[in-house]
Amino acid sequence: MPDILMQFDVAAEPATVFDALTTKQGLAGWWSTRAEVPSAVGQVVKVSFPDAPMTWDLRIVDCTKPDLLAWHCVGGPPQWIDTDIAFGLGHKPEGGTLVLFDHRGFVEADAMFRIVSYHWAHILGRLASYAETGKPAPYANF
């Protein structure tokens, strides 16, 4: 099974990055301005995108501030169903955050996998920028 694995630095503290991942305002700052964002393990985050006929439904598996956010995809495009997404956040001694991003469990490295890989790279750059500056630049702005 192919996986998407990325590592990048953010010039913001882990708690700031964590809030960008786990709050409605945070997700609206870098991913989508239309999202339902509960905060408890077992609840489902629902993210919408323009022209998409469905929401991306992500069950919260772990939400340990400020170290880890993990989701399990329970709704969305067929290629996403039963995949797992995790954001590991580590404090850098010199300041800032080391982000370890995993999106695991794709069935095959098909065209959709390649598209998702490309878009995650683009979107995660927006996450870093938002956490560093506080200026929203969402991927999907309704």
Question: What is each of the regions a protein language model found here?
Answer:
Residues 1-36:
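Hydrophobic ligand-binding cavity/cleft-lining segments
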Residues 1-3, 15-16, 45, 55-57, ...:
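Charge-dense, helix-prone N-terminal extensions
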Residues 17-21, 27, 45, 60, ...:
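Hydrophobic pocket/interface hotspot
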Residues 13, 47-48, 115, 142:
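Alpha-helical scaffold segments that form or flank carboxylate-/histidine-based iron centers
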Residues 39-44:
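Short coil-to-beta transition motif at edge beta-strands of beta-rich domains
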Residues 7-11, 46-48, 59, 88:
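Generic structural detector for well-ordered beta-strands
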